């Protein structure tokens, strides 16, 4: 399970600054979702190959009223959601009554907490830490969030308490074994495939995720899974269809079949982000009657940035007239252009219409995401693409793209080597992405392209001459000087 870390503290102690610094490696932030995360912002971050989720909260001062009280309530809720808490204090302001109140709350909750003394730049670090040591939350960690000082030591301490998931492959691990030249493209099973394709059902509240989950598992099955753990835990349900194994990651909560139609699903951003990270393929459920809303776009953006294979399901399609259907299709084409690689299905989870067709798209998306190709195949596609549409000129020189190889899978990462690659326009990268997708027949998975510049192996090396060459050089220089002197004498 991906660790969840909450940032809490008084207002203006640097929580948002630290949040932005931690999540900058992956610009995939789900935040300010109306009515859901109004006062909490969620982001994904990576450090030394480990993924974790960060929650940024509003400040707590202890005397809140009105909207400030709501912000404090959201902060306390974030503490309950998190696996660990970074409690930020301001070294310049010193310890306050609000700091002591928050520290007391953390001690009572018995939550794994780390006291982080921020803004220690230009201060005596030892004195700053000593002032907050009596709070009883362990040895304070000193950082300067705005300048990045102390962040590495802080992350070592925090992430060190979480065991690495032995079943979670490192990014790009699927592509470590090189496909030999002349071999066909092949798929190497990942560690998760023994339990089948991990399938996450994601979507806004009340779009029909519960109904779809039960439909996929079989109408006669009453879901009574009630696993021990915190309220963040998703439910993992193995099942088979047509001799294919799947593991369904259910984020919609524990429910009984007789109640799912009346129940209002509780939406948890943490559950959603963790399910996306742990899945192989995401089935994104939307309400056809409501069309595409901003919340859908936010969640789809996170799926795209996570690199997971994607299938889109428009639910409640059967209750619409033809005019409404035509309008929704137009909106899908207009607003979902950034995930145009994903198959879209129009279904009714309640009546089962179209649900069976989802599996074919799930299988196709998964296989596209993990298939690997030899360098010769990718380089040939690159050469054909460059031949059809050459890269632009930069300062009068043509960008040269020499060869391509696979750098990772799920999602496919294609590494292209060449010269002046820093100047490749985004439009040309998009052209290459579409070309690789079309030729390799990739469906349902994002594709990423990374450039690497050519390196001159002789750069910085001096040309070493032999003794004979050195003597010859001296003779030539001496001869040149004598000839130059004779020319000057003649002019006189």
Curated annotation (Swiss-Prot):
Q: Which SUPFAM superfamilies match?
A: P-loop containing nucleoside triphosphate hydrolases (SSF52540)
User: Per the record's keyword annotation, is Transmembrane helix included, yes or no?
Assistant: no
Q: Name one GO biological process term.
A: ribosome biogenesis
Annotated GTP 1 binding lies at 9-16, 56-60, 118-121
Q: Carries keyword Hydrolase?
A: no
Acidic residues composition bias: residue spans: 168-181
**EngA-type G domain: residues covered:** 3-166, 197-370
- GO MF terms on file? GTP binding; ribosome binding
Cite the KH-like domain residue spans from the record. Answer: 371-455
Q: Where is this region: Disordered?
A: 166-190, 453-492
> Which residues participate in GTP 2 binding?
203-210, 250-254, 315-318
Task: List compositional bias (Basic and acidic residues) regions by residue number.
Answer: 461-470
Q: Which residues lie in Basic residues bias regions?
A: 471-492
Q: Which InterPro entries match?
A: G_ENGA, GTP-bd, GTPase_Der, KH_dom-like, KH_dom-like_a/b, P-loop_NTPase, Small_GTP-bd
Coiled-coil segments: none
Superkingdom in the source lineage: Bacteria
Any Pfam family:
MMR_HSR1
Which terms are listed as keywords in the entry?
GTP-binding, Nucleotide-binding, Repeat, Ribosome biogenesis
HAMAP family documented for this protein: GTPase_Der (MF_00195)
Main function: GTPase that plays an essential role in the late steps of ribosome biogenesis.
What family is this? Belongs to the TRAFAC class TrmE-Era-EngA-EngB-Septin-like GTPase superfamily. EngA (Der) GTPase family.
- How is the subunit organization of this protein annotated in UniProt? Associates with the 50S ribosomal subunit.
Alphabetized NCBIfam families for the sequence: GTPase_EngA (TIGR03594), small_GTP (TIGR00231)
Write down what this protein is called.
GTPase Der
Q: Which organism is it from?
A: Ectopseudomonas mendocina (strain ymp)
């Amino acid at each position: 399970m991906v660790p969840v870390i909450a940032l809490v503290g008084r207002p203006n102690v640097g929580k948002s600054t630290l949040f932005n610094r931690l999540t900058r490696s992956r610009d995939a932030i789900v935040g300010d979702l109306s009515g859901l995360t109004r006062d909490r912002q969620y982001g994904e971050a990576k450090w030394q190959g480990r993924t974790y989720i960060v929650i940024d909260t509003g400040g707590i001062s202890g005397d809140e009223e009105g909207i400030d009280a709501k912000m404090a309530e959201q902060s306390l809720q974030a503490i309950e959601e998190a696996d660990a808490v970074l409690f930020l204090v301001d070294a310049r302001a010193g310890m306050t009554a609000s700091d002591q109140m928050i520290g007391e709350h953390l001690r009572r909750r018995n939550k794994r907490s780390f006291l982080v003394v921020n803004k220690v730049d230009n201060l005596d670090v030892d004195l700053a830490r000593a002032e907050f040591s009596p709070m009883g939350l362990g040895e304070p960690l000193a950082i300067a969030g705005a300048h990045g000082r102390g962040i590495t030591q802080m992350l070592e301490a925090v992430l060190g308490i979480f065991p690495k998931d032995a079943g979670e492959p490192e990014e790009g691990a699927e592509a470590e074994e090189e496909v030999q030249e002349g071999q066909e493209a092949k798929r190497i099973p990942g560690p998760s495939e023994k339990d089948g394709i991990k399938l996450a059902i994601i979507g806004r509240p009340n779009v029909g995720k519960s109904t779809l989950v039960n439909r996929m598992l079989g109408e006669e099955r009453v879901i009574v899974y009630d696993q021990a753990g915190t309220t963040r835990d998703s439910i993992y349900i193995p099942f088979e269809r047509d001799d294919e194994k799947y593991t369904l990651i259910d984020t919609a909560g524990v429910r009984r079949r007789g109640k799912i139609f009346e129940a209002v699903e509780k939406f948890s951003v943490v559950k959603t982000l963790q399910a996306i990270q742990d899945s192989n393929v995401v089935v994104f459920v939307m309400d056809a009657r409501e069309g595409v809303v901003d919340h859908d776009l936010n969640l789809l953006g996170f799926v795209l940035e996570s690199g997971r294979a994607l299938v889109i399901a428009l639910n409640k399609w059967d209750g619409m007239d033809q005019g409404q259907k035509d309008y929704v299709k137009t909106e899908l084409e207009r607003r979902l252009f950034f995930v145009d690689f994903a198959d879209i299905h129009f279904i009714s989870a309640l009546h089962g219409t179209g649900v069976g067709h989802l599996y074919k798209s799930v299988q196709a998306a998964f296989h596209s995401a993990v298939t690997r190709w030899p360098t010769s195949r990718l380089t040939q596609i690159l050469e054909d693409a460059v031949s059809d549409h050459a890269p632009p000129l930069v300062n009068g020189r043509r960008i040269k793209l020499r060869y391509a190889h696979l750098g990772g899978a799920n999602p496919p990462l294609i590494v292209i080597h060449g010269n002046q690659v820093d100047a490749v326009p985004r439009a040309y990268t998009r052209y290459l992405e579409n070309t690789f997708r079309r030729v390799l027949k990739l469906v349902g998975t994002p594709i990423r392209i990374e450039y690497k510049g050519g390196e001159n192996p002789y750069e910085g090396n001096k040309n070493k001459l032999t003794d004979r060459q050195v003597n010859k050089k001296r003779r030539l220089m001496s001869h040149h000087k004598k000839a130059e002197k004779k020319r000057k004498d003649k002019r006189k």
